[in-house]
């Protein structure tokens, strides 16, 4: 505006836009919050302009869609004052997500956190990403969120979700990247393990280096490795840890679909791949009890020719330090 231009020309320091200024302004927002396209058609880097009145924007081509400001916090972002906005973007149907938007003194959108492409990283089965707490430290965010559907929860939109999380995010110039996430589950606090650490366990099992592998597994699994696997003429080691096995992805075990006619449910990974699990049953290979909220599933690949489904996987007990504690393989364990 002219007033802003004159103030800056006279040497007044930059200041972050106030909540009142933002709540009644035309602003750039992430495309998924722009009221024009469905969330599935929008891109993470896409942008739209909307007009807020008393903190809410509506009236786009997406019927009943609206974007509502929930909170405004000031900070210094990349050397300049900035306002960090927590907003809920409701897509016009049953779903909506909380977004983070950062505006500089000129009310230009300079950064945003779009949770939609990263929901698996943020907790797996999340219908609506709901931020319950926001803290800002320069270009870093600390968020708390809930509404995470964990194993044992019912798997439909309106069901009660038992999981929540806290996470730190750092701006890398393109997006806010999660640097540490702690999930709060029925099993206690859980961090996902590093894939390299899980791979070390798999490599040790394949190499018959059981003394090394034992540091990452329960004793009952180690003693079962050279027993015959169910429905197989091979051992557990041969069936579930063949040479060349690589860890594809590890996820917090989510709420699962209803069982099919064979009693199997599908688990979805963030990379679009799937695995089968017999929900609710105790392991048949290692008697460590049934799967639990807070468990971690790691999908294994047998070769470079990946299909859309992990043929084998291993289940870990979640640990607060992200340590590896494997207790059973699958799907033969079902």
Explain the meaning of each model-derived region:
Residues 11-42, 124, 129-334:
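Acidic, small-residue rich beta-repeat scaffolds with periodic aromatic anchors
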Residues 90-94:
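Extended, low-complexity, turn-rich repeat/linker tracts enriched in Gly/Pro/Ser/Thr and Asp/Glu
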């Amino acid at each position: 505006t002219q007033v802003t231009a004159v103030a800056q020309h006279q040497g007044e320091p930059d200041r972050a836009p106030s909540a009142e200024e933002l709540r009644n302004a035309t602003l750039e927002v992430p495309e998924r919050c722009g009221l024009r396209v469905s969330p599935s058609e929008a891109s993470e880097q896409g942008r739209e302009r909307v007009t807020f009145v008393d903190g809410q924007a509506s009236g786009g081509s997406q019927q009943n869609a609206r974007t509502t400001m929930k909170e405004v916090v000031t900070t210094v972002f990349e050397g300049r004052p900035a306002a960090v906005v927590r907003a809920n973007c409701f897509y016009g149907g049953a779903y909506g997500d909380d977004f983070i938007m950062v505006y500089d003194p000129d009310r230009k959108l300079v950064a945003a956190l779009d949770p939609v492409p990263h929901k698996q990283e943020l907790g797996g089965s999340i219908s609506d990403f709901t931020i319950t707490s926001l803290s800002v430290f320069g270009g870093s965010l600390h968020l708390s969120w809930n509404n995470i559907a964990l194993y044992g929860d019912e798997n439909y939109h309106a069901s009660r979700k038992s999981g929540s999380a806290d996470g730190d995010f750092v701006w890398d110039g393109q997006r806010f990247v999660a640097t540490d996430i702690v999930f709060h589950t029925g099993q206690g606090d859980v961090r996902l393990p590093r894939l390299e650490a899980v791979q070390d366990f798999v490599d040790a099992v394949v190499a018959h280096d059981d003394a090394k592998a034992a540091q990452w597994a329960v004793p009952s699994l180690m003693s079962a490795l050279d027993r015959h696997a169910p429905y197989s003429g091979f051992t557990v080691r041969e069936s579930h840890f063949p040479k060349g096995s690589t860890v594809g992805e590890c996820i917090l075990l989510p709420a699962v679909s209803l069982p099919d006619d064979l009693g199997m449910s599908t688990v979805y990974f963030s990379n679009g791949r799937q695995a089968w699990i017999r929900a609710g049953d105790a392991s048949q290979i290692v008697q460590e009890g049934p799967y639990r909220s807070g468990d971690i599933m790691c999908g294994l690949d047998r070769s470079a020719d990946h299909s859309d489904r992990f043929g084998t996987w291993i289940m870990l007990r979640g640990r607060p330090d992200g340590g590896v504690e494997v207790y059973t393989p699958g799907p033969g364990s079902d």
